[in-house]
């Protein structure tokens, strides 16, 4: 059969990324407590296209993805090598967005339930391999100003901490989640019985955090971790008494 994609293109315009997106695919990721965890990822995969090639072969991306076993740093790099080889490309890109579940016990009744954390792996490889790992962690914040000026109570809300890192050495997803949770007014739990709800309410009140405080607490922990060489942190507070959200952002490198 005629291979239309491989026909010559006379316009001479190279394409930086061409590929597939929003592919829902079962994957297995590493889990600190249970060794592995099965989840569903939404995958984007792309490759650089030479200026004299008319099109890419979309099915070859899926063929390369289908060879994956456990999705980790080494496996992602091998996937990018396969994409480069199958597509005759100098550079390849892939991103996995997926829900990850961490079993947590509540602070008083010790009720066990999973907490969903949205995660992503984003990687590319030309001459060098570059991998970013991201987590989006739901947490609880309580406003220090509201507490200070009020006779009783303080406005509080859910916030989301996005931590994205490039690593020198391996870190568990759970470790990044713990950094976010320990920096907030209080962690979140999927189930709260009344004694747990009391603990969470009082814990947050005793530990108020502006969005700026939360961001800085995360950065203090990340910047002191030698396993991390680069980081990006974004905190968004879903404000409960305002008709807007609040956010804070920082990006940096660990040079040591």
Curated annotation (Swiss-Prot):
Pathway: Cofactor biosynthesis; 7,8-dihydroneopterin triphosphate biosynthesis; 7,8-dihydroneopterin triphosphate from GTP: step 1/1. The record marks 143 as: May be catalytically important. Its EC number is 3.5.4.16. One of its GO terms (molecular function) is GTP cyclohydrolase I activity. Disulfide bonds: none annotated. Keywords: Hydrolase. InterPro entries: GTP_cyclohydrolase_FolE2, GTP_cyclohydrolase_FolE2/MptA. GO terms for biological process: tetrahydrofolate biosynthetic process. It catalyses: GTP + H2O = 7,8-dihydroneopterin 3'-triphosphate + formate + H(+). Converts GTP to 7,8-dihydroneopterin triphosphate. Belongs to the GTP cyclohydrolase IV family. HAMAP family: GTP_cyclohydrol_B. This is GTP cyclohydrolase FolE2. It comes from Caldicellulosiruptor saccharolyticus (strain ATCC 43494 / DSM 8903 / Tp8T 6331).
């Amino acid at each position: 059969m005629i291979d239309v994609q491989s026909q010559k293109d006379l316009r001479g315009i190279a394409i930086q990324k061409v590929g597939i997106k929003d592919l829902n695919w079962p994957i297995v990721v590493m889990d600190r407590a249970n060794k592995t965890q099965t989840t569903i990822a939404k995958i984007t995969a792309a490759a650089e296209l030479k200026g004299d090639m008319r099109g890419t072969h979309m099915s070859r991306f899926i063929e390369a993805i289908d060879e994956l076993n456990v999705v980790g740093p080494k496996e992602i790099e091998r996937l990018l090598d396969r994409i480069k080889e199958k597509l005759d490309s100098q550079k390849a890109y892939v991103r996995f967005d997926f829900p990850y579940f961490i079993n947590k016990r509540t602070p008083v009744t010790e009720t066990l339930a999973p907490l969903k954390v949205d995660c992503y792996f984003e990687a590319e490889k030309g001459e060098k391999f570059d991998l970013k790992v991201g987590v989006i962690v739901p947490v609880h914040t309580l406003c220090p100003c509201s507490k200070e000026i009020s006779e009783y109570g303080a406005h509080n809300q859910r916030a989301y901490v996005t931590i994205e890192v490039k690593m020198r050495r391996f870190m568990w997803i759970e470790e990044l989640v713990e950094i976010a949770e320990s920096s907030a007014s209080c962690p979140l739990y999927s189930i709260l019985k009344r004694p747990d709800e009391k603990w969470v309410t009082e814990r947050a009140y005793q530990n108020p955090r502006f969005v700026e405080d939360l961001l800085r607490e995360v950065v203090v922990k990340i910047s002191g971790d030698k396993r991390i060489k680069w980081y990006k942190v974004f905190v968004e507070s879903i404000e409960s008494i305002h008709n807007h959200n609040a956010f804070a952002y920082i990006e940096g490198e660990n040079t040591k």
